[in-house]
Amino acid sequence: MMQLGGGTPTTTAAATTVTTATAPPPQSNNNDSAATEAAAAAVGAFEVSEEMHDRGFGGNRWPRQETLALLKIRSDMGIAFRDASVKGPLWEEVSRKMAEHGYIRNAKKCKEKFENVYKYHKRTKEGRTGKSEGKTYRFFDQLEALESQSTTSLHHHQQQTPLRPQQNNNNNNNNNNNSSIFSTPPPVTTVMPTLPSSSIPPYTQQINVPSFPNISGDFLSDNSTSSSSSYSTSSDMEMGGGTATTRKKRKRKWKVFFERLMKQVVDKQEELQRKFLEAVEKREHERLVREESWRVQEIARINREHEILAQERSMSAAKDAAVMAFLQKLSEKQPNQPQPQPQPQQVRPSMQLNNNNQQQPPQRSPPPQPPAPLPQPIQAVVSTLDTTKTDNGGDQNMTPAASASSSRWPKVEIEALIKLRTNLDSKYQENGPKGPLWEEISAGMRRLGFNRNSKRCKEKWENINKYFKKVKESNKKRPEDSKTCPYFHQLDALYRERNKFHSNNNIAASSSSSGLVKPDNSVPLMVQPEQQWPPAVTTATTTPAAAQPDQQSQPSEQNFDDEEGTDEEYDDEDEEEENEEEEGGEFELVPSNNNNNKTTNNL
């Protein structure tokens, strides 16, 4: 007992004396149980509050026999629990004894179960469980006996020595009850006749040192009241003796708890949502500010680019206007410049001979001509060809803008070219190069809104005239609504007037020089290169009209765009025509009969 209780030797001796001499053992156990309960409530309250977290609500239910065995073991060890300051080893002993009875429970579970049973007993006794009577708890008898034994033992220690026999009788009755309940052996009733005088003071001192009855009642009442809300649920669930009112209270507590928990969760969610919305609004505002600043910068950049483009366009327009004004001044000054001197007279006979060969085929041999040396006409032909090539290849100073213009000419532009060329035809009939003529035509086209230089105008004129020549020389009859050569009527009218003029000049020149008469069935003048020289007296005769080019191109039946073709096709045709002219396919020089007669006479 000294090892379990941990008390002083004097106290142990006094307790032994009281137990063996004056009080029966069951009564001392009951008194010790009350004191031990008060000490357990005082010392282990903090431990219980911490261990409830690990145990949780509910737990494993204890059978009735196991609970009764726990109460019996705890009642037997009441003195040890009363004297011990550390209760851990004592509960380990309780757990070991429970294992001996066949119940496997650790010290912690045993301690918790005893505390819950005792607290529920106090509540039922005080009427705080809502029951009609306090004696409805199934362990009420055992706990009440334990409590009554503790109270009786304490009162016995407080009374005087003469009253001990009466206490013994009462204790005997109580012991009988306890023996019937706990199945304990009967107490020892032997009373010592004399007691040492020294044993009484320690006994009295042992009784007066702890004031456990008052402490246990007050402390346990306060402790059970303060912690009833935290332990009521677990004790009710373990005991299972609650009524409908208890269940309602328990449900009400759970409802309040969950409502408070849900309110906290909802408040937290609302706070998080509010912060989230504030962050989203802040980011949206920042994005709008960035977009607005970017939009302002873009507008400023576009305005700057527009201003720069407007300045460039104005500068380009000013430059173009200055260039146009300069070109107009040059075009106005060029026709007034003095005309260059005509070529030597020996070139004219060959040119006139070429025109006569194209206009009329000879029907009869020409009249005798005065003798003339042969090398002179040949030289004239060569010089004429060279001059023609030089004039056709002239105007080499072509501007890049003109070369970049489109190769295809619209119908309106071609009609404007024909009109300008027709109007200026009479002005440039005199001898001289045709460069000023095409410069003036180019200036006129530019005034009409067509950007074509002199070389392009000249090439286009030659191409459409060549195509007109092919259509004219074809044997097929051209219908009135034909789509080929849409400028046929304009060019035909132009050349009819020109043929009349040239025919009159040729007749006058031939009659004055050689007395030749123009035949009636003369062929109209076909188009020739632009370098045409005035008619002159020649000694050469033309070949029959049968000396035509071997290859004749048929008129095209394509549409307007296909009829005109590109400039490259026309350039190929120019080369073919020049090759034919150089080969002398259209005319040849033949010595006259007069020269032959004179040679014969000389011989």
Swiss-Prot record:
Bias type Acidic residues, positions: 559-586
PROSITE patterns linked to this entry: MYB_LIKE
SMART domains given in the database record: SANT
GO function term, MF aspect, one: transcription cis-regulatory region binding
Pro residues biased stretches: 363-376
InterPro entries: Myb_DNA-bind_4, SANT/Myb
Location of region: Disordered: 149-201, 220-249, 333-408, 532-603
Keyword entries, A-Z: DNA-binding, Nucleus, Repeat, Repressor, Transcription, Transcription regulation
Domain Myb-like: 60-118, 401-465
Biased composition regions of type Low complexity, renumbered to the chain: 168-178, 189-198, 221-236, 344-362, 532-555, 593-603
Highest taxon in the source lineage: Eukaryota
Comp. bias (Polar residues): 381-408
Disruption phenotype: No visible phenotype under normal growth conditions, but the double mutant seedlings gtl1-1 and df1-1 exhibit increased root hair length. Reduced amount of seed coat mucilage.
Localization, UniProt: Nucleus
GO biological process, any: glucosinolate metabolic process
Entry keyword annotation includes Transcription regulation: yes
One cellular component (GO) term of this entry: nucleus
Signal peptide range in chain numbering: none
Function per UniProt: Transcription repressor that negatively regulates root hair growth by directly binding RSL4 promoter and repressing RSL4 expression. Required for the synthesis of seed coat mucilage.
Further facts: Plants overexpressing DF1 exhibit very short root hairs.
The name this protein goes by in its record: Trihelix transcription factor DF1
